[in-house]
């Protein structure tokens, strides 16, 4: 069916003698797609898009379905694989799956200004046809053993679960493939928002007069047998800095290749800001770095590897950030990779200071800048940690700092060179670094008296699971489960807890909100004979916040677990993992990894600002999907998590007054988590607690006028309470979009003017 497009924002209808076309006047133009009969049934469809670009570029088109049940928490975006389309006709096809009946459809044609015509159509497919389409696309993207594994797994899914299971599983992989191939192209993004041309740099330099203080940066660079080509490129990137109060401190680690020292000396003769020392014997990177630090006279020390490069504005942005944030004693920036041809790729847009993520991966790394006095306080680099010497340094530095003394500049200011032997090219290149990092983290736990151990993650070099010990005896956990009938779901939930939970001390408290079915009431009678289960009646209109607050008041467990009745436990260690974090005094609310029954992600943490208030990360991606820089597989601090499965110490719950009973259904968990965060605790999400979430199956969907009106009131309430804070999630980089899928590039970035 061909679809009619009606402009809603940032679009002008234009015409000339030959045709009628559209002009996108901003970076967020959108159409309302007019659906036959006002809605479209859920299911599988092939989408065809034909655009004729007349002027400018079409980049990153996206389709946004709105569902009849108010799928609010997971506002879905379906990227269309069209990147940097310039003058001429462009056609593209992708498969889409509407998870329920679609009541409205929004089409955003481009994130860039342009003039164009567009035709959009949908054709419905059956499950088998959809599976065939996805399998064909996925096989074309694989080769060899990868194709064999995909075919075998698909055949197994078909045999064990029929066409539906096969299509569901394929869709998870297809969604991940679509994201990998359709994400906004970094080249286009840097063209618009990171102009390193002479003209672009000249414009950026206009901010230099803002600087009142001009601290000196001592750039510490150890060298050893560096290919001269990359050594020159590295030093040139320092010499080209727009900010001029720097010194480059080079320590050559007794390179056998004489041209390395000759090259360094040629730069020393040319620029008095370059200082160098040649070590008599090779001592490896930590010792060489310390030799370079001995040359430093600046207030701040920045770390630079001998074959990498600084962005021309790196020191300028660091100086501006330090002036605006005088408490900072340490800062880190975003980074990307650069190949031998100078092409940039794979940006790492980082979270602000994220202590738990930092223990799972070195999310500080490049560019790291430290107050020189701090480096001297901790004794510089420690030998014996080569390959992870910068991680060990950062661990020891942060032990002496308050969180507000650790800053993040959300700009790509460091380019990590991808050459043979570099971990930028392949993280497994230096396996010794993997084990050095483990030792560094273990040493950190010894120094801080933290009862935790570092566990490797099989198949992932440089990423770790931190397992915290729980006290003996284990504190009592009260699991609160609100329910109304749907005994099938409740039985599945409780059975899975009893059969698959290794944590030794918990009680299950069912909060009955007016169940009437005889099967449910009979089940209640049977389960109350279990010593760890009781049923509390709650005879009032449904209010998720009020029900759980009531349950908390009527129980005494040191730890409170909030669980929906449609949750099903997967891994036996789920509660031990969550409680081990919740018992840490600095931690507030702890969330889990939740999957839909088809093994796609339903919840991998909540990002503030997505869709206006908040949204889930990585919705619809297959189980095992790594996410941006493996963040979907690592424990980390986040601003919020879903209360469908959350754990929190009773003292924290009570300190903030529990859930806000003015929020009956929507966003009560987001509001609760923000209040906990504002009270000084860090919320945390762990992928090592895995459960299924058969979402909203008991309460029903937000599909009536009254429910929709209530949802809008609650949305407005949260927006009014938290305001601009919702668009400034410290754990979500401002270079990522709030309007498209989480962790895709923002057009423009929200920090463009800073």
Predicted feature descriptions by range:
Residues 343-363, 592, 609-639:
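Short, flexible, basic/aromatic active-site loop/helix in glycosyltransferases
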Residues 164, 168-239, 442-446, 450-499:
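N-proximal low-complexity "stem/linker" segments adjacent to membrane-targeting elements
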